């Protein structure tokens, strides 16, 4: 197909999908991406595309559609990009009404949140958005003893959610709501649906396991209220009294029988409330009250937490409330990657991990640092969807999604790991002009200069391709014959033409004339492998940028210090 016809086709498609205005850069990228043989003619193609895009943009949207139907009717059979994306929507929610759906994500700020947590966050947010509803971020921070919240993690979670494209309509801190929990606890005691138990924990456990009532269970409400006041005013110490919700003492799951709702923590030293409060609600009590108070209509909950609903329904039944629709999903994990907050914390404290963003981990911060885009995480989670079974994805699954997203945006550079000098005889000075991206000539070029008498550097990884008497092509430079291989390599210029190398099936390797020091950190299971080498001297990379080191892989530039570049390997 002639370039003009291709340009017209893609200009019309791009215009129709973008309110009648085509983008010449996008059209050029599409033409070269699907027709790589035209890349060598990129300079000639650009003015042709610019002219056709200008003409297409003068047409009305209806005229553009009519013209495209004449030259490419298949487009309308396939459906537009937008229509295709809409087909990938999540399944409808039960009992969901437009404008009335309220969802929540309730992380404990005792550590950075990870891919597994992100599933509930993304599903909750996407469904709220789908139904023009409301998404609440509720910090579940009422355990100042076992899962102690820390101020740094409140901010981390908000930042990570924003990076994932999740903007809460409301942020709620459970630790700000203790007076509300106290009010409902007292009401339940007055209703005879809760009581204050002062049994030693072991003694209560024995009674519970036998389905026998605790001696305090059926004592008068007045006695219970007196004990409740003692809990609040400090007359009971930690472990001496607990508020329990009355349930079925013969329930098949002993953990459901008269479960604990509030307990005493003598010196909570809470990061937000200090030691102001000493009676703290447990998760199921605080969560049940807040879901009602905040008007939550739909809860997305891991299958492993399904018993929470059983406990919480007792409170809803006692108050005559309607329990939110609960959607259970399985766990999500990555093969060989640690998601456990307790294991991560222990590893950090022992010096095993560098921090919550150590690239070996599965925290959102670690994935971000490694070069995974937020869109890749969202796409992965939406693909898995609401499956009730546990899902373990391989790193390759996530990498494949990410590769598709980063490939069009990542500029290309040469990085030579473990460099070995190569001296080339009989070669004249030559400048290799290489596009920053093969599909986007409009981004510009990088120039690598070969100077006679000076070495270039090739990677030790390519030594097996270098045999005396053999030939190779130096990518975007010229072809050489290998003369000697040792601590240095000697070669002789052969020819410039790529066709010569292609015809003879000579292997192609990358190189740098001189370079800036560069280290690539490669996560491999529990290890961090460091590859040292040289990056193109004039590589204009910035911290946080994702680029491709050709023949090596996609990396994220982590740090630049004193002209030394440190990158983290993402994937091939």
UniProtKB/Swiss-Prot annotation:
An MF annotation (GO) of this entry: glutamate-tRNA ligase activity
Enzyme type, top EC level: ligase
Principal subcellular localisation of the protein: cytoplasm
InterPro entries registered for this protein in UniProt: Gln/Glu-tRNA_Ligase, Glu-tRNA-synth_arc/euk, Glu/Gln-tRNA-synth, Glu/Gln-tRNA-synth_Ib_cat-dom, Glu/Gln-tRNA-synth_Ib_codon-bd, Rbsml_bL25/Gln-tRNA_synth_N, Ribosomal_bL25/Gln-tRNA_synth, Rossmann-like_a/b/a_fold
A Pfam cross-reference name: tRNA-synt_1c_C
Motif ('HIGH' region): 107-117
Keywords from the UniProt entry: Aminoacyl-tRNA synthetase, ATP-binding, Cytoplasm, Ligase, Nucleotide-binding, Protein biosynthesis
Compartment annotation: Cytoplasm
Enzyme nomenclature, EC number: 6.1.1.17
Domain of life (superkingdom): Archaea
Record bears the keyword Aminoacyl-tRNA synthetase: yes
GO cellular component term of the entry, any: cytosol
One GO BP: amide biosynthetic process
NCBIfam families: gltX_arch (TIGR00463), PRK04156.1 (NF003169)
HAMAP family, alphabetized: Glu_tRNA_synth_type2
Protein name: Glutamate--tRNA ligase
Organism: Pyrococcus furiosus (strain ATCC 43587 / DSM 3638 / JCM 8422 / Vc1)
Encoding gene (name): gltX
């Amino acid at each position: 197909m002639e370039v003009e016809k291709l340009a017209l086709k893609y200009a019309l498609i791009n215009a129709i999908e973008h309110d009648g205005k085509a983008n010449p850069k996008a059209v050029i990228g599409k033409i070269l991406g699907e027709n790589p043989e035209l890349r060598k003619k990129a300079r000639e193609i650009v003015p042709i595309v610019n002219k056709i895009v200008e003409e297409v943009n003068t047409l009305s949207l209806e005229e553009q559609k009519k013209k495209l139907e004449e030259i490419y009717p298949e487009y309308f059979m396939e459906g537009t990009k937008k229509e295709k994306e809409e087909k990938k929507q999540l399944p409808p929610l039960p009992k969901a009404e437009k404008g009335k759906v309220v969802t929540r994500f309730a992380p404990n700020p005792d550590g950075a949140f990870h891919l597994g947590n992100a599933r509930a966050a993304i599903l909750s947010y996407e469904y709220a958005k789908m139904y023009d509803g409301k998404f609440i971020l509720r910090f579940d921070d009422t355990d100042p003893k076992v899962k102690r919240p820390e101020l740094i993690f409140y901010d981390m979670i908000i930042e990570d959610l924003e990076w994932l494209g999740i903007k809460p309509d409301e942020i709620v801190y459970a630790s700000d709501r203790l007076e509300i929990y106290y009010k409902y606890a007292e009401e339940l005691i007055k209703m005879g649906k809760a009581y204050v138990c002062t049994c030693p924990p072991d003694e209560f456990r024995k009674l519970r396991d036998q389905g026998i009532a605790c001696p305090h269970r059926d004592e008068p409400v007045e006695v219970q209220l007196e004990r409740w006041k003692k809990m609040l005013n400090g007359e009971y110490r930690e472990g001496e009294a607990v508020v329990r919700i009355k349930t079925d003492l013969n329930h098949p799951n002993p953990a459901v029988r008269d479960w604990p709702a509030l307990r005493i923590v003598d010196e909570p030293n809470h990061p937000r409330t200090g030691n102001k409060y000493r009676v703290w609600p447990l998760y199921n009590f605080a969560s049940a009250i807040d879901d009602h108070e905040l008007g939550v209509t739909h809860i997305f909950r891991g299958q492993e937490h399904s018993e929470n609903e059983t406990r919480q329904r007792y409170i809803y039944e006692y108050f005559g409330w309607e329990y939110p629709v609960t959607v259970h999903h399985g766990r999500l994990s990555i093969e060989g990657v640690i998601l456990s907050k307790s294991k991560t914390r222990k590893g950090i404290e022992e010096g095993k991990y560098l921090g919550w963003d150590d690239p070996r981990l599965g925290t959102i911060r670690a994935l971000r640092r490694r070069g995974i885009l937020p869109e890749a995480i969202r796409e992965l989670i939406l693909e898995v969807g609401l499956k009730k079974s546990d899902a373990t994805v391989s790193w390759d699954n996530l990498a494949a999604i990410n590769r598709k997203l980063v490939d069009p945006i990542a500029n290309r550079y040469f990085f030579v790991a473990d460099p070995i000098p190569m001296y080339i005889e009989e070669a004249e000075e030559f400048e290799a002009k290489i596009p920053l991206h093969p599909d986007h000539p409009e981004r510009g070029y990088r120039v690598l200069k070969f100077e006679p008498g000076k070495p270039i550097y090739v990677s030790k990884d390519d030594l097996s391709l270098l045999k005396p008497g053999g030939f190779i092509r130096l990518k975007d430079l010229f072809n050489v014959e290998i003369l000697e291989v040792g601590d240095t390599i000697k070669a002789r210029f052969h020819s410039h033409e790529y066709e010569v190398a292609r015809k003879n099936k000579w292997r192609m390797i990358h190189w740098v004339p001189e370079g800036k020091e560069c280290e690539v950190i490669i996560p491999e299971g529990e290890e961090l492998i460091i590859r040292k080498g040289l990056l193109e001297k004039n590589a204009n990379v910035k911290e946080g940028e994702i680029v491709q080191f050709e023949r090596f892989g996609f990396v994220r530039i982590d740090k630049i210090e004193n002209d030394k570049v440190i990158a983290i390997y993402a994937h091939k």
